[in-house]
């Protein structure tokens, strides 16, 4: 009895099951590959938005979950929202650093009223130094000439001799001697010596006062600048600070980089006021003392002329009182 050998080839049912399994695996492979990028993309979206109270869970990577159920993920390159206050702070800081804080730069950026105040104070300062130079040379020259004229008057023995010595017109000694001679000529027929002396002294006194007024001309401007320049500068400061506060209200920020340039421009006006006022006050006091010394020298010259007048009057009286010899027979 012969035994039948089993066939080595698979049966048709097993072959079909193997083919069906292979085709099913090929169908599920694209679905699994499509689900994996979706899960990876949802992770950066959750990290980019930490302020979200509850993040949506990432879909499962297996193929059992349908693709349509995955939540929509935010794009990775979406712009991050910036706080408006931070943007304003950065912008204000940039504007503050852009200001030129040199004196010329602050002048250019100042308000028109503050500019006018600064220009006026600068002109006042120039006037102060101009008066100091001009009046200083004038006083030094006048004092030097007057010392020489007083020395010449002291060497003179009579008013006529003094007029010959001080014959240069325009000098103070010439003016004093000329007025004294004019008064003596007008009072030639007067016998009262004291009346002549009083009239000559009065005329010399007026000349001394006039010379003092002439020498003091221009110094009143120094007093005016010294007393008003600080207040003018303060006005410019108040105006500039007022504009700074208005700018603060408009920009709605108290950042020091924005506020400081406007306040610095305002304070520059006060600084210019002090620069104009302090030298004016000092120079005015120096001139006041120097002019007082000049007036004292003029008074000395006037006293010397009055001394010569008194001497001439005494000589005239002695000549009139001298006896005359009369030849008899």
Swiss-Prot record:
<dbReference type="GO" id="GO:0005886">
    <property type="term" value="C:plasma membrane"/>
</dbReference>
<dbReference type="Pfam" id="PF01618">
    <property type="entry name" value="MotA_ExbB"/>
</dbReference>
<feature type="transmembrane region" description="Helical">
    <location>
        <begin position="18"/>
        <end position="34"/>
    </location>
</feature>
<feature type="transmembrane region" description="Helical">
    <location>
        <begin position="220"/>
        <end position="241"/>
    </location>
</feature>
<feature type="topological domain" description="Periplasmic">
    <location>
        <begin position="242"/>
        <end position="265"/>
    </location>
</feature>
<keyword id="KW-0472">Membrane</keyword>
<comment type="similarity">
    <text>Belongs to the ExbB/TolQ family.</text>
</comment>
<dbReference type="InterPro" id="IPR014164">
    <property type="entry name" value="TonB_ExbB_1"/>
</dbReference>
<keyword id="KW-0677">Repeat</keyword>
<keyword id="KW-0653">Protein transport</keyword>
<feature type="region of interest" description="8 X 5 AA repeats of P-[AV]-A-X-[AP]">
    <location>
        <begin position="30"/>
        <end position="83"/>
    </location>
</feature>
<feature type="repeat" description="8; approximate">
    <location>
        <begin position="79"/>
        <end position="83"/>
    </location>
</feature>
<feature type="repeat" description="5; approximate">
    <location>
        <begin position="59"/>
        <end position="63"/>
    </location>
</feature>
<feature type="repeat" description="4">
    <location>
        <begin position="53"/>
        <end position="57"/>
    </location>
</feature>
<dbReference type="InterPro" id="IPR002898">
    <property type="entry name" value="MotA_ExbB_proton_chnl"/>
</dbReference>
<dbReference type="GO" id="GO:0022857">
    <property type="term" value="F:transmembrane transporter activity"/>
</dbReference>
<keyword id="KW-0812">Transmembrane</keyword>
<keyword id="KW-0813">Transport</keyword>
<dbReference type="GO" id="GO:0017038">
    <property type="term" value="P:protein import"/>
</dbReference>
<dbReference type="InterPro" id="IPR050790">
    <property type="entry name" value="ExbB/TolQ_transport"/>
</dbReference>
<keyword id="KW-1003">Cell membrane</keyword>
<feature type="repeat" description="7">
    <location>
        <begin position="71"/>
        <end position="75"/>
    </location>
</feature>
<feature type="topological domain" description="Periplasmic">
    <location>
        <begin position="35"/>
        <end position="111"/>
    </location>
</feature>
<protein>
    <recommendedName>
        <fullName>Biopolymer transport protein ExbB</fullName>
    </recommendedName>
</protein>
<feature type="repeat" description="2; approximate">
    <location>
        <begin position="37"/>
        <end position="41"/>
    </location>
</feature>
<comment type="subunit">
    <text>The accessory proteins ExbB and ExbD seem to form a complex with TonB.</text>
</comment>
<feature type="topological domain" description="Cytoplasmic">
    <location>
        <begin position="288"/>
        <end position="329"/>
    </location>
</feature>
<comment type="function">
    <text>Involved in the TonB-dependent energy-dependent transport of various receptor-bound substrates. Protects ExbD from proteolytic degradation and functionally stabilizes TonB.</text>
</comment>
<feature type="repeat" description="1">
    <location>
        <begin position="30"/>
        <end position="34"/>
    </location>
</feature>
<feature type="transmembrane region" description="Helical">
    <location>
        <begin position="266"/>
        <end position="287"/>
    </location>
</feature>
<feature type="repeat" description="3">
    <location>
        <begin position="44"/>
        <end position="48"/>
    </location>
</feature>
<feature type="topological domain" description="Cytoplasmic">
    <location>
        <begin position="135"/>
        <end position="219"/>
    </location>
</feature>
<feature type="topological domain" description="Cytoplasmic">
    <location>
        <begin position="1"/>
        <end position="17"/>
    </location>
</feature>
<feature type="repeat" description="6">
    <location>
        <begin position="66"/>
        <end position="70"/>
    </location>
</feature>
<keyword id="KW-0997">Cell inner membrane</keyword>
<keyword id="KW-1133">Transmembrane helix</keyword>
<feature type="transmembrane region" description="Helical">
    <location>
        <begin position="112"/>
        <end position="134"/>
    </location>
</feature>
């Amino acid at each position: 009895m012969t035994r039948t050998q089993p066939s080595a080839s698979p049966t048709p049912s097993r072959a079909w099951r193997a083919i069906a399994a292979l085709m099913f695996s090929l169908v599920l492979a694209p679905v699994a590959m499509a689900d994996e990028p979706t899960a990876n993309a949802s992770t950066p979206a959750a990290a980019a938005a930490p302020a979200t109270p509850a993040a949506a869970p990432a879909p499962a990577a297996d193929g059992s979950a349908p693709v349509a159920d995955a939540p929509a993920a935010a794009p990775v390159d979406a712009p991050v929202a910036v706080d408006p206050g931070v943007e304003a702070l950065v912008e204000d800081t940039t504007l503050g650093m852009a200001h030129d804080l040199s004196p010329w730069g602050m002048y250019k950026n100042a308000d028109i009223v503050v500019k006018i105040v600064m220009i006026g104070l600068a002109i006042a300062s120039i006037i102060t130094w101009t008066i100091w130079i001009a009046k200083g040379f004038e006083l030094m020259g006048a004092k030097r000439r007057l010392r020489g004229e007083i020395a010449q008057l002291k060497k003179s023995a009579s008013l006529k001799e003094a007029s010959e010595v001080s014959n240069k017109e325009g000098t103070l000694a010439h003016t004093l001697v000329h007025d004294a001679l004019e008064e003596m000529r007008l009072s030639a027929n007067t016998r009262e010596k004291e009346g002549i002396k009083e009239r000559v002294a009065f005329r010399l006194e007026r000349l001394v006062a006039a010379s003092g007024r002439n020498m003091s001309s221009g110094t009143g401007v120094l007093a005016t600048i010294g007393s008003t320049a600080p207040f003018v500068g303060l006005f410019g400061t108040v105006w500039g600070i007022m504009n700074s506060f208005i700018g603060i209200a408009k920009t709605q920020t108290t950042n020091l980089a924005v506020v400081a340039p406007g306040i610095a421009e305002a304070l520059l006006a006060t600084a210019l006021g002090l620069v104009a006022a302090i030298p004016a006050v000092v120079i005015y006091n120096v001139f006041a003392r120097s002019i007082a010394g000049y007036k004292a020298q003029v008074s000395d010259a006037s006293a010397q002329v009055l001394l010569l007048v008194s001497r001439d009057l005494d000589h005239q009286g002695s000549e009139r009182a001298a006896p005359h010899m009369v030849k008899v027979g």
